[in-house]
Every structure is written in C-alpha cells, then in structure tokens.
C-alpha cells in the first residue's frame, strides 16, 4: 500500500483498533466479573450500591431473605457474562480482519451490533437515571453516566469517523 492510500485510511486504521480493543475489553470484563462475583463478593460488580438504591434492599437484606436468591442473582450475572464473551470474540475478530481491510459488511455488522447493544445498555441506565441514580460503575445493571460517555466515544472513533474510508 502506498503512502497516499495509507494516510487516507487513518480513521479506519484507528477505528478497527478501537473496535477490536472494545471486543477485548468485553472479553476481559466477562471473565473477571463472574470470578469476582462467585469467589470474592457479589457486591463488587454484580449488586452494587446503585442497585441497592434502586431496589431499596441491601445485599445483606437480600441474602437474609434467601441465601439462594443471592446466589441466583450472581448466576444471572455469570450467564450475562457468558454472552458478553461471545460478543467480544465476534467483535474482535470482525474488527481485526474484515473491518481492518475496510469491508463494508464488517462495518455494517459492527455498527448494528454495537448500536443495539448501546441502546439496550443506555435504556437500562436511563431507567436508573429516571430514579435519580446516575452511577459511576456501582451497579451490575446500569453502566452509569461515565461509561455511557466512553461508549459514545468508542462508537465515534471506532465506527463513525472511519465510515468514509471503507472500500467501495
């Protein structure tokens, strides 16, 4: 590839790396959360202080009501993380090979997968916002305002800016 083609694809060069990194982040998060939830404490990543505000029940109250309910809540998070691993693997592989080459189908696949994922995550988070809980990574459900901002930046730099550099 000559220098003209290389420089004209600067956003795509950044974009595929951002999206592949986003996939890796999802995989890492999806491995760490179940380990912490099951082996250390569910209150660190599965049922945080924002969740207690949302439900009106502390983790201790839930476990006092039913230890099995607490365990079940942890298993729900583990099952969600199982899906995040698959999402992360697909995100990373589609980004690394076809999106890096500028293939439009890869961009469309990443766009739709990430927009739907974002809408779902933002919807859950706005449910918390509607109750005055803005979050800073202290919930197993809501991603919180800081993470929504990061997510928007990932979509801008990973997909929006590179869109014009795709192969025709």
Model-found features: residue ranges?
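Topology signature of small-to-medium multi-pass alpha-helical membrane proteins
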Residues: 2-168
């Amino acid at each position: 590839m000559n220098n003209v083609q290389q420089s004209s694809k600067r956003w795509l060069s950044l974009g595929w790396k951002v999206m592949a990194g986003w996939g890796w982040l999802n995989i890492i998060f999806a491995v760490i959360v179940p380990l912490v939830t099951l082996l250390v404490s569910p209150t660190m990543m599965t049922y945080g202080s924002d969740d207690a505000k949302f439900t009106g029940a502390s983790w201790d109250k839930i476990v006092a009501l039913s230890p099995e309910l607490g365990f079940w809540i942890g298993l729900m998070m583990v099952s969600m993380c199982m899906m995040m691993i698959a999402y992360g693997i697909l995100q990373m592989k589609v980004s690394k090979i076809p999106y890096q080459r500028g293939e439009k189908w890869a961009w469309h696949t990443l766009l739709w997968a990430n927009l739907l994922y974002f809408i779902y995550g933002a919807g859950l988070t706005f449910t918390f916002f509607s109750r005055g809980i803005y979050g800073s990574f202290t919930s197993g459900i809501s991603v919180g305002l800081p993470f929504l901002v990061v997510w928007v930046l990932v979509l801008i730099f990973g997909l929006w800016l590179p869109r014009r550099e795709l192969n025709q």
